[in-house]
């Protein structure tokens, strides 16, 4: 069972890392936010706007996984998808940065509402994803702020210190740009 200090630490990190990401993004001009890094690979090739849309999509998806784990014992998450986001990744560059930032704020607020409902014992519930394997709700939720850190680095043009542990494949590689 998750102890209160671990839960407080989780919420603090989720709030802090999202704040850092939003601060970084809000400093960009529209032109800077649409810049395509030419020497990057995978998700690092995306514009800052595409990064924002992706983070929002993943937040909605991870939250759907957490919700399913609350409903069912160790569910298979293969077909579980998050709800729609304001701006899908494929349309990100057609929208103002302010709309993407607002969606990132909205998505995090929705996640924090889910966390408020959780009992300490709920954090031990598990769910299994073909991409990541079996994780507890606490592990799924920790992945949010780690994901934020990864995209902070990518937007800044740095190599991320955080590398997700994929069991099978990598998400969103189908949407990378050809070099």
Question: Where on the chain are the PLM-derived regions?
Answer:
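A short, mixed-charge helix-start or loop-turn motif at secondary-structure junctions
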Residues: 3-7, 48, 90-97, 130-137
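Solvent-exposed interaction patches of small proteins and small membrane subunits
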Residues: 5-12, 34-40, 95, 99
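Cytochrome P450 catalytic-domain "roof"
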Residues: 27, 32-34
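Acidic/histidine-rich alpha-helical segments that form the ligand environment
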Residues: 13-17, 24, 85-124, 141-144
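Residue-level detector of alpha-helical secondary structure
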Residues: 13, 20-27, 54, 61, ...
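Short, contiguous alpha-helical
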Residues: 35-83, 112, 124-179
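Extreme N-terminal tail/first-helix region
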Residues: 1-24, 164
């Amino acid at each position: 069972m998750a102890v209160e200090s671990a839960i407080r630490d989780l919420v603090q990190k989720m709030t802090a890392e999202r704040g850092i990401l939003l601060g970084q993004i809000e400093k960009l001009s529209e032109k800077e936010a649409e810049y395509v890094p030419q020497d990057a690979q995978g998700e690092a090739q995306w514009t800052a706007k595409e990064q924002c849309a992706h983070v929002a999509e993943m937040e909605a998806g991870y939250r759907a996984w957490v919700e399913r784990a609350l409903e069912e014992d160790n569910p298979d998450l293969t077909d579980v998808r998050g709800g729609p986001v304001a701006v899908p990744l494929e349309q990100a560059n057609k929208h103002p940065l302010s709309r993407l930032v607002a969606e990132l704020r909205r998505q995090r607020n929705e996640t924090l509402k889910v966390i408020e409902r959780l009992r300490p014992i709920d954090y031990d519930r598990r769910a299994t994803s073909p991409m990541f394997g079996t994780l507890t709700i606490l592990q799924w939720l920790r992945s949010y702020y780690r994901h934020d850190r990864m995209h902070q680095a990518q937007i800044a043009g740095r190599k991320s210190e955080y590398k997700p542990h994929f069991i099978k494949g990598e998400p969103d590689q189908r949407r990378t740009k050809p070099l």
